[in-house]
């Protein structure tokens, strides 16, 4: 491709709303153009990178035995109602009516659509397993689209769906997809971690995320410093926390604690470690059908509530903070809420305790009475308490798998795999006949990769102050030939001959034959991030050209007659 005829409108200034380097460089480099909030056009350079990523994904998915399809972008709303996600997905699901007042949605994922497909054709265990995937456009009506391709409303995704006769075969496919995804992201040149994850609005049981490590990442992951354990903070577990100080010894009794409303004040008042205090976080929980009620989550005073864990524990769609006025209206004393008689006092359906509180002794808890707390609280004496993993893992907490410690890292989610089970097939009536001739729901898995997001993720991990640094498998071109002076016949002729020779060798090469200043051409090379540049300049008189490595901007002198062989070795 000749740069003089190539549509690559580069810009000197960064977009005003660009806070990430990927957003800035992809727009400045002419890879993408913003046309609306969270909506981007892919220009020729961006399309070339997208195609490179798409091809890697397709090759590995096909190798794993999956079959490519293309499902409708528009989905009948009735399918989403039947699966129970029409309300649960919230306002991010774009809903609309056609001219006949039929309800439709723009699919952010396609579980419902693919189940409907399988329902019509898969009738017997003999047709299983089956894995279908697509690389297609999606739409999610983000409330605050930001960070360029990282969090847009319109995006390209690889979404795959597998169907099985039993859980064992699903687990086999799940493990196969984990290995396949690892190969994909390794081929793309990414430093990534596989982490335990929450299933979110997709549902199902086991799930894992693939996180590209980058300080600009939106997700926080807990990583062990000694083993391979890693998990999204929303799903991270830890070794049970312990403290050096012994539990306070006190018989059960009520103490007057005037204006002692915070955990810090309570620990100071009784001269104990916050570990031995009982904290309650009260939230207003919202469920399907618009129903809402107060939910109570008890933890040790030194811990924080992980809201995603809490939301999942009670099956809520959303949790919101509760004001002191709302607590008082419910008959509670803010700052003094405890487990004793709480059910009778509030009629609450959701009173949960963190797993690490099971059989805890010597605790200090609110007495549900102003200016009073109980000491000597032993939770093992309570009956019918519900224990769930509620606490957020902190840096320095113990790894659940070894004696190591957990640290935080930032990551960009680029892939997510799920064990769905019968989460969709059962409500949508997708059944098959097993070997005994009995009807049962299809067992499912689903597997996603953010294809357009990967463009941004590569740059977030591979850039410098000058621009993009594409990896070998994602670069729009392998190499650019920079003609220092296009008015010099010898430079131009040599560049043309090298360009033709490289094309014959199957090298994707960009010939910068523009009548521009040398400095401008090099600035564009650095901005675009093509892996290598051959500079044809004054050194040609002495039979020399320069080879520049974009990753480190190191230059090397190469004999003009040897450059073709040198390039083929790269």
UniProtKB/Swiss-Prot annotation:
Main location: cytoplasm
GO process annotations (BP): prolyl-tRNA aminoacylation
InterPro entries: aa-tRNA-synt_IIb, aa-tRNA-synth_II, aa-tRNA-synth_II/BPL/LPL, Anticodon-bd, Anticodon-bd_dom_sf, Pro-tRNA-ligase_IIa, Pro-tRNA-synth_IIa_bac-type, Pro-tRNA-Synthase_IIa_type1
Listed EC numbers: 6.1.1.15
Record SUPFAM superfamilies: Class II aaRS ABD-related, Class II aaRS and biotin synthetases, YbaK/ProRS associated domain
Gene3D superfamilies xref list: Anticodon-binding domain, Bira Bifunctional Protein, Domain 2
Subcellular location: Cytoplasm
Keywords on record: Aminoacyl-tRNA synthetase, ATP-binding, Cytoplasm, Ligase, Nucleotide-binding, Protein biosynthesis
Any one cellular-component term (Gene Ontology): cytosol
GO MF terms held by the record: aminoacyl-tRNA deacylase activity; ATP binding; proline-tRNA ligase activity
Family: Belongs to the class-II aminoacyl-tRNA synthetase family. ProS type 1 subfamily.
Role played: Catalyzes the attachment of proline to tRNA(Pro) in a two-step reaction: proline is first activated by ATP to form Pro-AMP and then transferred to the acceptor end of tRNA(Pro). As ProRS can inadvertently accommodate and process non-cognate amino acids such as alanine and cysteine, to avoid such errors it has two additional distinct editing activities against alanine. One activity is designated as 'pretransfer' editing and involves the tRNA(Pro)-independent hydrolysis of activated Ala-AMP.
Subunit structure: Homodimer.
Protein's name in the database: Proline--tRNA ligase
Organism: Wolinella succinogenes (strain ATCC 29543 / DSM 1740 / CCUG 13145 / JCM 31913 / LMG 7466 / NCTC 11488 / FDC 602W)
Gene name of this polypeptide: proS
């Amino acid at each position: 491709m000749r740069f003089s005829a190539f549509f690559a409108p580069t810009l000197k200034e960064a977009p005003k709303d660009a806070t990430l380097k990927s957003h800035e460089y992809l727009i400045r480099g002419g890879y993408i153009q913003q046309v609306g909030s969270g909506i981007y056009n892919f220009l020729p350079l961006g399309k070339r990178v997208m195609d490179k990523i798409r091809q890697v994904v397709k090759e590995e998915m096909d190798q794993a035995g999956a079959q490519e399809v293309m499902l409708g972008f528009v989905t009948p709303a009735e399918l989403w109602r039947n699966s129970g996600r029409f309300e649960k997905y919230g306002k991010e699901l774009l809903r609309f009516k056609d001219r006949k007042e039929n309800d439709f949605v723009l699919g952010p994922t396609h579980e419902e659509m693919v189940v409907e497909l399988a329902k019509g054709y898969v009738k017997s265990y003999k047709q299983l397993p089956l894995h279908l995937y697509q690389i297609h456009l999606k739409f999610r009506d983000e409330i605050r689209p930001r960070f360029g391709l990282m969090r847009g409303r319109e995006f390209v995704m690889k979404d795959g769906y597998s169907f099985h006769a039993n859980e064992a075969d699903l687990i086999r496919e799940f493990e196969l997809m984990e290995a396949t995804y690892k190969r994909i992201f390794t081929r793309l040149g990414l430093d990534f971690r596989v982490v335990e994850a929450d299933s979110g609005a997709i549902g199902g049981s086991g799930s894992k995320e693939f996180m590209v490590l980058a300080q600009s990442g939106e997700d926080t992951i807990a990583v062990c410093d000694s083993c391979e354990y890693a998990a999204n903070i929303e799903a991270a577990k830890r070794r049970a926390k312990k403290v050096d100080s012994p539990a306070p010894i006190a018989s059960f009794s009520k103490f007057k604690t005037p204006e002692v409303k915070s955990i810090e004040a309570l620990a100071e008042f009784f001269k104990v470690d916050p570990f031995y205090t009982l904290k309650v976080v009260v939230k207003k929980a919202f469920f399907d059908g618009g129903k809402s009620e107060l939910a109570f989550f008890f933890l040790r005073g030194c811990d924080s509530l992980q809201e995603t864990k809490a939301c999942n524990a009670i099956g809520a769609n959303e949790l919101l903070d509760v004001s002191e006025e709302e607590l008082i209206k419910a008959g509670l004393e803010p700052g003094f809420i405890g487990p004793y008689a709480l059910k009778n006092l509030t009629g609450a359906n959701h009173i949960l305790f963190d797993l690490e509180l099971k059989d805890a002794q010597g605790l200090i808890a609110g007495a549900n009475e102003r200016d009073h707390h109980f000491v000597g609280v032993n939770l093992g004496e309570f009956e019918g308490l519900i224990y769930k993993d509620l606490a957020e893992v902190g840096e320095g907490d113990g790894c659940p798998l070894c004696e190591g410690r957990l640290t935080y890292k930032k990551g960009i989610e680029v892939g997510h795999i799920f064990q769905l089970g019968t989460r969709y097939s059962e409500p949508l009536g997708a059944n098959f006949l097993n070997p005994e001739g009995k009807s049962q729901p299809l067992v499912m898995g689903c597997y996603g990769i953010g294809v357009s997001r990967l463009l941004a993720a590569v740059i977030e991990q591979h850039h410098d102050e000058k621009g993009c640094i594409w990896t070998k498998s994602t670069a729009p071109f392998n190499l650019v030939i920079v003609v220092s002076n296009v008015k010099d016949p010898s430079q131009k002729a040599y560049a043309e001959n090298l360009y033709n020779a490289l094309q014959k060798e199957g090298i994707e090469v960009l010939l910068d034959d523009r009548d521009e200043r040398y400095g401008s051409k090099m600035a564009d090379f650095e901005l675009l991030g093509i892996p290598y540049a051959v500079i044809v300049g004054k050194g040609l008189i002495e039979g020399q050209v320069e080879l520049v490595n974009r990753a480190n901007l190191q230059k090397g002198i190469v004999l003009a007659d040897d450059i073709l062989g040198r390039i083929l070795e790269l």
